[in-house]
């Protein structure tokens, strides 16, 4: 709860900022999208948001000046390869000792990110100040935010003349009520806001009905080009990919594998990913307690996940929710059929049940295990769905999705609040 004094200070600061913005607006240049900056929490890590943002940056860099601004630097080099023409800069380098003032600020919690945002623990007063200063130095171009904490700061502090685009990589209904309330108050300030799925687009249209952004569109992620051949679907390997977090549901996948291993002891489950050491230890303990130590393998992170997918025959998704499901498309791009829980919202918008994979509507692990066993038992079905998966993935190539971003950016240069072309809105 804010004290009366703090509320007065905050209102005064925002009032002063509004005055500065009005003055700057008088000198603001015409809308210009030749420069694009993408804000990421940590561009040096691994994960779907990072991979897809880097993929988008590489496409836009063919015709634009593109910079990825990472709020934190957590490694010497990014986990994913940075495409030609893309610069990566950072605001808080956590690989080297900080100065005394930076240490003091870094020990203070963020004042701009709601505690309910999952990035709250990573951001702090130092990242707040450095991000605000970086934004206020901008004079033109486009800035793309990629998560609520960043988006909320962007809507407050982006100066006139800078076009703002918000992106969400998780579902609206997965956010805490307090975070949803902040989104409703602030996201209407965006020049454009993009969701990944049609279902989430509907949620945001409803949530932002009172204060909508100028453009509200759906643009799915594009599947990146991955090393590795199309799978032969002959290896007795089921694969799962993701960080070790409750949302990914690997506890449910291990439980599902009990029934699969009993019926098909010659098949193995390989889980690629990483997370907090205590989460990995809990997952490993679950595997051991289930008697699956030889059947379920924790493989760690792989920078060449396409090669690993090409050596698998089924991709399993046990998530409790998926903002999109980038790894589903990555598996499909290798001709691997997908068996997934029908969780909100991504899987059902990518997978066509019985065509390129199976959607399990029950949330019970046994149902997921039964669906995996069905694809193991029926080789003809596996091959048919694998071939269809390749065709599904082709609709998400960058040469298909990239032009939708180009159309949105072109629309941002158009005066007025007109909606983008239907092809962009999806």
Report the location of each language-model feature:
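N-terminal strand-loop element at the rim of the active site
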Residues: 15, 24-33, 39-46, 63-121, ...
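A conserved mid-protein helix/loop that constitutes part of the nucleotide-sugar donor-binding site
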Residues: 48-55, 236, 240-262, 269-271, ...
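A short, active-site helix/loop in glycosyltransferases that binds the activated sugar's phosphate group
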Residues: 153-154, 189-215
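Nucleotide-activated donor-binding/catalytic signature segment of Leloir-type glycosyltransferases, i.e.
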Residues: 281-300
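Aromatic "clamp/platform" in nucleotide-sugar-dependent glycosyltransferases that forms part
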Residues: 301, 320
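Conserved acidic donor-binding segment of nucleotide-sugar-dependent glycosyltransferases
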Residues: 352-354, 358-365, 373-379, 394
